[in-house]
Amino acid sequence: MSRPRASRPPVHLPDGVAEPDGLVDAVLAYETALLADDVEALDAAFAPGPDTLRGDASGLLVGSGAIADFRRGRGGIGPRTIERLEVRPIGEDAAVVVVTVAPASGGRGLLTQVWRRGVLIRPAEPGYSTSNRWLISVAQVAGPTPAIDGRVWRTVGSPLVAGAASGALLGQTIAVKDLFDIESFAVGAGNPSWLAEAAPADGTAPALAALLAAGASIRGIAQTDEFAYSIAGANPHYGTPPNPLVPGGLPGGSSSGPASAVASGQASIGLGTDTAGSVRVPASYTGLWGLRTTHDAVSRERLLPLADSFDTVGWLTRDGETLRLAAAATLGEGSIEPSPAYLIDSGLVAVADPSVQHAFAALTAGLAAETIDVGDIDELFETFRVVQAADAWIADGTWVTAHPGAVGPGTAARFKLAAAITHELADSARAAMRAHAARLDGLLGDSVLLLPSAASAAPSTTAPEVELDRVRAATIRLCCIAGLTGRPALSIPLMTVPGPFGGDAPVGLCLVGPRGSDVALVALGQRLAGQLG
């Protein structure tokens, strides 16, 4: 099969300015490498070193290493042609190149690049040298605007469903996780085979109806990890929603679509669910506020379940006040006031990556917090894991069994483990859960437990499965305290750590409060953010 090649378009320069020798050939070679997804050639086209830049609508990548890592996880581009090429020399060995491209799929894209020749790289750094070739030092990519980004949305409208004409949430827009009933729309659960068999709902989930009654409108139905059985944020059928705060990073799941939509400004409220961290983890990865509510405080009627013992409704927002208003619109303003005392378990925090531990210690150093010990963290995790898996098999096992091959490999592996849990093991784990909850309630009381919302910053979308499994296990160890006790947990974007591609990446500070303190916990978080931020 012949390799696609970029053809030479008309080249435009200012009157009297000569075309820089070899530059257009370098531009066309780069475009040819893009069309062929020749990763090695693409890497070689960028100036090596920490100062090379590449930006697009998803964010900015700094350094040639970060750009190369991103490219390996992106895949190739579709066929397209160069329509126009503008060259503006800015010296003997530098030029700005602006390229208009016409994708075969329609629309127009605009590429702006700074090319340099004879790029001098600090020779003391291993692998760096001086090159006399033309290389890209800055690239900005503006692709055609898609009618809908299928990684984020299943369907959208302007609005999809209008809310009430007045209320505390008037003007707010909701990205609804694809687990909630919306009248006249089917639930897809992140799986096309499930969606194909689903009937349109004959009513709307009360958790969503409360937001509509307060004046918010539905922007669209947002993607979810399959059956909500993941905290990574990847979906093998629809793709991985982009993380605007960490380009090339996972958005976190399973409320991945709502998180991506809110973080990118496409909606102001994400309506999600949290079983093992499915609101807190995406909030942490994408720099959002996120609240997992008290278990059973918000109706789960007309909500596709994953694990009845732990499933809760939650919200994702870009600021604390919008989150407080969403919580109050659903739960009312009446709320138990948590004690102003803070609790920290250093052994629990030690589950997180070292960079997160250091950021947490620095953030909380000025707080008067009591040290506690929640007990054997591995035992708590195992109890949670078994009960969650047993519940998940009750909820979805019959369908999964009847549809072999319909579920992606990661989710299928978790359902396979769930299927192997015996009734005796499940009963034993449920008894242990009740005992753990009683003991932890006595330990935590009405105080607020502080811990990281996730064990790490957002991993790369190309991270190996063994690394994702490690991060998942560590993060669920942090998240399971709220799950086992049914307590609300708030994630606030107050920490940053080195990201997977260099630069800073967000990590949330988590506040676990007493049951029924949901609205007051958000208000406490707002005050704490003002104090620490």
Where are these regions (language model features)?
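Short, well-ordered alpha-helical
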Residues: P89, R133-A198, A228-Y229, A458
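Short glycine/serine-rich loop/turn segments
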Residues: T173-F310, A454-V466
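Amidase signature
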Residues: R3-P4, G143-L169, G332-I476
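Short, low-complexity N-terminal intrinsically disordered segments enriched in polar/charged residues
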Residues: M1-P48
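Glycine-rich, small-residue loops and helix-cap segments
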Residues: D427-G533
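Structural helix-boundary/capping segments
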Residues: A139-A147, R151, S264, I269, ...
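Surface-exposed, charged secondary-structure patches
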Residues: L53-R54, L61, G65-R108
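Short beta-strand edge/turn micro-motifs at domain boundaries
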Residues: G107-P146
